[in-house]
């Protein structure tokens, strides 16, 4: 029996990826690195920040930390007015009527997660941050932690993700997972293990 809905944050609850792309472009420009949408999808989306700067620039330590902080501060400046993915509030309302709980499982830093959730006027009963559990997506640990905190089996939850990395994380934890078509191709999400893809959360109502 379904008892919980688990959501990724960026690109899933709201289409924040264009803002992340802009912030990355600005902070990486002084390094002579141009980030186009395809590079963002392949090398940035769904990954932890330390992995990103190590991959793109070979940076680690204090310089990497300063770059990451600058990027995330710029993202929060840009993300002042966010709109939820269509159907999100309706899905959460229907889930509440059915007695389902819900949570957010994200690779985002805590400050970003709080900012986005506040902008969307959301207060999830559960928030799992990859940076606090020790491993990020695509590792299944964040979703395993979510299940453990809720006291649920994988088949008692549904996960919603927008990136192949996130899909692999949820599927690796055994959770039936659906891909949101906010940035990645449907074929890539299905190849990562998504049962199906959705253009918005109105389509997810039929899953309850």
Q: Residue spans of the language-model regions?
A:
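N-terminal helical cap/lid subdomain that shapes the substrate entry/recognition surface
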Residues: 2-98, 109-114
């Amino acid at each position: 029996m379904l008892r919980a809905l688990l959501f990724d944050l960026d690109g899933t609850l709201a289409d924040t990826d264009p803002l992340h792309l802009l912030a990355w472009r600005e902070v990486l420009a002084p390094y002579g690195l141009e980030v186009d949408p395809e590079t963002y999808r392949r090398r940035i989306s769904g990954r932890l920040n330390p992995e990103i700067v190590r991959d793109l620039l070979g940076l680690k330590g204090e310089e990497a930390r300063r770059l990451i902080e600058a990027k995330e501060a710029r993202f929060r400046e840009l993300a002042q007015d966010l709109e939820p993915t269509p159907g999100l509030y309706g899905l959460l309302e229907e889930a509440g009527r059915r007695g389902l709980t819900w949570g957010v499982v994200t690779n985002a830093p805590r400050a970003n997660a709080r900012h986005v959730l506040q902008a969307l006027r959301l207060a999830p009963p559960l928030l799992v941050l990859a940076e606090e559990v020790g491993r990020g997506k695509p590792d299944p640990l964040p979703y395993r932690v979510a299940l453990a905190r809720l006291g649920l089996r994988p088949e008692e939850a549904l996960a919603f993700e927008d990136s192949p990395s996130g899909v692999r994380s949820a599927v690796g934890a055994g959770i039936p997972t659906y891909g949101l078509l906010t940035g990645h191709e449907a074929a890539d999400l299905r190849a990562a293990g998504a049962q199906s893809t959705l253009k918005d959360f109105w389509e997810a109502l039929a899953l309850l």
